[in-house]
Amino acid sequence: MERITVYTAQRIYTMDPGRPVASAIAISEGRIVSVGSLESMQPWLRRLPHDIDDRFKDDILMPGFIDPHTHLRMSGTYMGLHYVGPITSHAPSGPQAPLASRDAVLVRLKELVEATNDPERPIITWGYDPGMQGGHLDRDMLDAISDTVPIWVLAYAPHIVYTNTPMLERTGVTEDTTAHGIGRYPDGRLNGWFIETSAVGTATRPVIKDVYRPGFGQEALLHQAKVAVQNGVTTVADMGWGFESFEREWDDHMAVVNQPDFPLRILMTPFEARLNGKYGDDALDYLKSMASQGTDKLSVHGVKFINDGSYPSMTLRLNFPGYLDGEVGLTGETPWAEMVARMLP
């Protein structure tokens, strides 16, 4: 064992019911040797060289929090877009003000359309929350803002994209399209909704170079890591690896997470529908090969199956009485019986 460093504090909260509170913690080689008091760890300190570090003597320490469901790279990337959400967004460029209602969002979208000097370039926004801002957007609402400039709005929980007619036309979706997650009005017309991962992918393809800008993935990770640490989080699981690209996402994480000063451990959990779609019967072999490349700070863990939507986006599948607008949500793109079969060993 290398030299021990002992950090003292006013109080240290532990996760050990036998010793829930301590006043010192001994570390060596990046691992905990002992938690207790300077007196209780004397058996170690008498035998091994050590230093006492009292920089935290007036502070209260606690274990780092674990966030089991994040999308740091994805979320950080979206923060580079125009924001139309209901709470303040702490983007890399600075705090972005919230919009309280759907009407306020429509006003903001109109401002963005009027400010553009390129009517061929889509207005790309993110953060809309139908539950908090007064209900869903739709094609007719967005067409009333502009029926010439393409408008693309991603929900805060990114399970829905809302589009106007010019943007809808760029996706290639027509009235004859029968793909899962393509929204329609009660009369059968396309309503500009793209619901859940497959449909969101369809809506994103025409703007993918604007959403996932080159080099922004690593910058997004660095920014989101700062946000996490400011809130006491030290370990996260990315529950959507592969949504954009397995290779690009992994490379960005490897380049950033393993830097000595990067403050998080990240567990990468692949999105099963993308994994199966790309690798098929070789999916498990691919995961094993990627797991072998993992490090202490970046590892592969589990597989994510999505069977329905998102509660904030009001696409989560509900039984009676459903949502206030009468909808009951949507199943995922993979039929449930098929999903169960793919879960089995």
Regions found by a protein language model. Give the residues of each.
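Glycine-/acidic-rich phosphate or pyrophosphate-binding loops and their flanking alpha/beta elements
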Residues: 288
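Accessory "access/gating" subregions that flank catalytic or transport cores
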Residues: 291-294
